[in-house]
Amino acid sequence: VELVDSHCHLDDAQFNADRPAIIHRAREAGLKYILCIGTGDGPPDMGAAIRQAEEHVFVYATVGVHPNDAPKITSDTFKDLERLAAHPKVKAIGEIGLDYHWDVPKDAQLPAFIQQLEMAAAMHMPVVIHTRDAWADTLEVLRAHWAPKGLPGIMHCFSGDPAKARECLDMGFYLAFGGVSTFPKASEVREAARVVPGDKLLLETDAPYLAPIPFRGKRNEPAYVAHTARVLAQTRGEDVEQFAAMTTANFARLVGITSYTEGSVKKHVL
């Protein structure tokens, strides 16, 4: 089986004690690609994911300012972001978006989101979108500032209904489903997964967060994406190996990976 984890935080401190074992289990489980999300612990730490990508040939990275870190942005942040995004193993800008769950000022989040969308478009890079308790505003910003660019992106940890899925698909997004889709009460999310065309589906973990059944509540890791793959393949009435291979090919196509060898050597931009 060939699997992809299109969204994890391999650089998270929760993995510091046993990261080599995490990588080994991912390989054993059939992970062909891992996308490590380079938001770090705020803007000064955006490059942490790149270090993981430089260490492991099947790991790739993103860089971006998470909406919860928007107030930490300084005059240097976007210059740093553009420099890091030029690294050959950085494949997208993200995760970026809007998060109204916590008390982070909207007047900091919105301009950070829009500026990163514009930067990604200028660099012809996909985006990884985070939205939490902010669907209406997120979709409005994407309609105005991303859809007209004709570039793809990933809706991370998709948790909407089929109508929201269709709206994201209409704007050219791939939809990434994670551990939440395995939860008993997530029937609406599974219904959305049913309506997504096969060539627009991705798998993710968001590790170390949001572990799928049967590991819910425990530390998540990339190898667990296999459990999500089984649930979603069953939901769609598809063979799990074919489903896994399809989502893995989708990821490679989206981010433009043509071989393992690219960017696997140490780079100097950090």
Predicted regions and their residues:
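Mid-domain alpha/beta scaffold segments of enzyme catalytic cores
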Residues: 1-270
